[in-house]
Amino acid sequence: MEKMTVSSNYTIALWATFTAISFAVGYQLGTSNASSTKKSSATLLRSKEMKEGKLHNDTDEEESESEDESDEDEDIESTSLNDIPGEVRMALVIRQDLGMTKGKIAAQCCHAALSCFRHIATNPARASYNPIMTQRWLNAGQAKITLKCPDKFTMDELYAKAISLGVNAAVIHDAGRTQIAAGSATVLGLGPAPKAVLDQITGDLKLY
């Protein structure tokens, strides 16, 4: 009788254990499937919204406008600065009143730096062409500095002062396809030029 009771109890315990394991496995599989279904549904929904134009990628949008940027420059003869000793650098002056995102600012600074380099280094027919200053800048590590500018009025003053001192300069105007009005002056590029001369122009500005 005791053997039958022990055997019966063992069978019940074994059945209970098996049931518990089955329940746990079933719950785990159900949770996993539900999670996968939710992820798949979210992915499909996002894909559909992107196709319908409801979602967009700000980075791609900013990059797509890059070819439409324009610069304002005067062909400035800067060879008179070649004999000034010391560090040669480029300054990128960023307007603060436009509310540009960091990505937007980075793109505009790239435009300004490339524009300044093209003016001073790529076309011997231009008055702004200055291979000596370019080489000094390249040999010293292409130093660049980013500075804050409060508004368009201040930027115009800085640009005029750069021209009067014979410093290579370019103002970048936005295409107006994403964040700000078309034609807005966003970044002023200065140089490459001796730091001593740039400080006369931007000495009162704060670092960005």
Curated annotation (Swiss-Prot):
Would I find Cytoplasm among this entry's keywords? yes
Keyword vocabulary terms for this entry? Cytoplasm, Hydrolase, Isopeptide bond, Ubl conjugation
Its UniProt entry gives the catalysed reaction(s) as:
an N-acyl-L-alpha-aminoacyl-tRNA + H2O = an N-acyl-L-amino acid + a tRNA + H(+)
Where is it found, in Gene Ontology cellular component terms? cytosol; mitochondrial outer membrane; mitochondrion
Compositionally biased tracts (Acidic residues)? 59-77
Subcellular location as annotated = Cytoplasm
Give the misc comment: Present with 2190 molecules/cell in log phase SD medium.
Q: Which PANTHER family match?
A: PEPTIDYL-TRNA HYDROLASE 2 (PTHR12649), PEPTIDYL-TRNA HYDROLASE 2, MITOCHONDRIAL (PTHR12649:SF11)
Q: What does this protein do?
A: The natural substrate for this enzyme may be peptidyl-tRNAs which drop off the ribosome during protein synthesis.
**Listed name of the protein:** Peptidyl-tRNA hydrolase 2
Q: Which gene encodes it?
A: PTH2
